[in-house]
Amino acid sequence: IVSTFQKIIVLEDDLVPFPYFLSYMNAALDMYENETNVACISAYVYPVKSKLPETFFIQGADCWGWATWQRAWNCFEADGKKLLEHIESNALQKKFDFDFTYPYVQMLKDQINHKNERLKAFSACCFDFLWIIFAALK
């Protein structure tokens, strides 16, 4: 699909999107199409108490309704070892773990070493987790 249309909108099969979901995604895909530091558009953010702007940037991605372009898809790195090397060689552990409040780097190490207990608890398959890491590094 991505090679035919140069972009894709992805939903998990059990999601019921907000009525304006497709309009939001298509507008965002058009708006950020040439922004190479933007790897994807996510439609979910964890609930927060403060009022957020209509659109904003966050580190990472979410697999519960997202969109991307062929340019980002073609750059996707599925090798967890290479992603970990990049994180460690650029001293990004603290940033990537949100000031060490969540063990994403350890989860990546566990994924590399085939110890997926945290990923199972996180309800993420290996692809989802690697895509989230890739997007965060963009």
Task: Please name every model-derived segment.
Residues 1-10, 15-138:
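An acidic/histidine-cluster motif and surrounding catalytic segment
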